[in-house]
């Protein structure tokens, strides 16, 4: 049982929509393992994703990570994890800056594809669409940098940093 399970069912989640880069998936697994956050991977990925490659991407964080795979966007929406909490999409086309949003326990933070973001149907399904302000002469942050910033703020707001030093 992971730390995410130990602290109750209404916990933050991170979801990656059809990731393009396997190294980013590995970084997301590590991020989620360290923060006690469940990770949803919405397939298809732009790279072959097997149980073996997932274990390789997780490195030694696999046993500490709660990773759920979903065959499609529709399967993700029907999953038990999606029946609670809001869907919070991080996008360069966001309506509100991260710092103006009030996170709640149970929110799922959704990250789009590195190459293309998410389609309109995903935008429409989101309860909130956020952006992280960056300098105007730059295009975007790495998807896992966005996930780390977003989860950090969400956990800060909801009191989710309840870890004791090792």
Short names for language-model regions:
Residues 1-166:
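Post-transcriptional modification and biogenesis factors for structured RNAs
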